[in-house]
């Protein structure tokens, strides 16, 4: 360690380093070694919470725990402290005459943030708090920096996101939210595995962006001397696996989109995509409802979800409505009628709906109407289906009205949570859709994709009728944990 670095340290950091050196002089490794526990805080509370002081004295049972020192009080020959492990906190009671003078010195000199191992007897204090009366302490790791805001947790938002480890130490609600996130993902896996789906892994580096309308991150492969993109979706590779005969596949993984950031968008996020052979979008609606409800039950039980004061009836059948019907109900505009792009654009001008310069089809106008007037009204879980072909380059046309596709999106609290459709498996139609996307890209649509000829070739070998689905995991976790910003469900959100 350089002299320059030491001079930059504050008083607390200097004192902690001196204590570290003192431990080493006593033959104690300041950063410890393997330590075997017999229980954690939650297990002890579950086992002994119904026992009073006298019962615990009669039982005379012991335990070995370990964790971070979060509070410490007392003076002279007696002290109390709280030790925090993954499951929570438990109090320890330390007496000099019980642990010995040398062992008690370890406790006295321990700083908040240090890790300790404690062996002792299970007891209840006169105040009624379940505790461990220490018979031996082991120093496990020295914290060289003090913890933030000792009693009130971490409150600075910038620090919470940049230094998530400090947030997890000091904010139990935040810690539990990320435990819940893991449980949600595990339950989704369990549900799909139970339905006969196979979890697979596909490449993160792609030669061509595809499977979604989004701007990609571009990188370079030095050995091959080619530009590549980070995936904006897993769709096209997963559908290749359907061609290969896997029939039911899903992937949970990171997606990368070089776009703006807001309360519900992060450039790097987690999605799940699911593909089922011999199914259509109606089957996938049922599957989506099952996934969402199963995840909700694992967190909130079999009932509605409360999100920001609104009761979301996630436990009831989801509403289903065609996009055109939803627009007509709110605006009175009937897009079931045949009309030219110019006529549709005139309706948009009349209703003050902004149109992008690359819009060339009636379907673009229909989608713009939906985004302008309908999305903000969708509070309860609602499947909106029948998207126009112009905005659904990978979805199969509806056989009864080829202007529209067998596609749906799930909306809850005005936000999209899932996107799905009967997959386009006609390679000729697929190529023409790719060509239309390439043209839109030339006209200035940054989110339009190029032509994936290899995927078209795969379809030429034959893909069975297939239903596909994508769900944003982060938004789902936000809903089920009642938070309003995606940064609160990402352990390490993107920061400047």
UniProtKB/Swiss-Prot annotation:
GO aspect biological process, one term: lysyl-tRNA aminoacylation
Record text on cofactor binding: Binds 3 Mg(2+) ions per subunit.
Keywords, ordered alphabetically: Aminoacyl-tRNA synthetase, ATP-binding, Cytoplasm, Ligase, Magnesium, Metal-binding, Nucleotide-binding, Protein biosynthesis
Substrates-to-products reaction catalysed: tRNA(Lys) + L-lysine + ATP = L-lysyl-tRNA(Lys) + AMP + diphosphate
EC class of the enzyme, as a word: ligase
Location, primary (coarse class): cytoplasm
Binding-site residues, Mg(2+) 1: 409, 416
EC number: 6.1.1.6
InterPro entries attached to this UniProt entry: Aa-tRNA-synt_II, aa-tRNA-synth_II, aa-tRNA-synth_II/BPL/LPL, Lys-tRNA-ligase_II, Lys-tRNA-ligase_II_N, Lys-tRNA-synth_II_C, NA-bd_OB-fold, NA-bd_OB_tRNA
Residues that hold Mg(2+) 2 according to the record: 416
Pfam families: tRNA-synt_2, tRNA_anti-codon
Gene3D superfamilies (UniProt xref): Bira Bifunctional Protein, Domain 2, Nucleic acid-binding proteins
HAMAP family listed in its UniProt record: Lys_tRNA_synth_class2
Similarity comment: family membership: Belongs to the class-II aminoacyl-tRNA synthetase family.
Protein name: Lysine--tRNA ligase
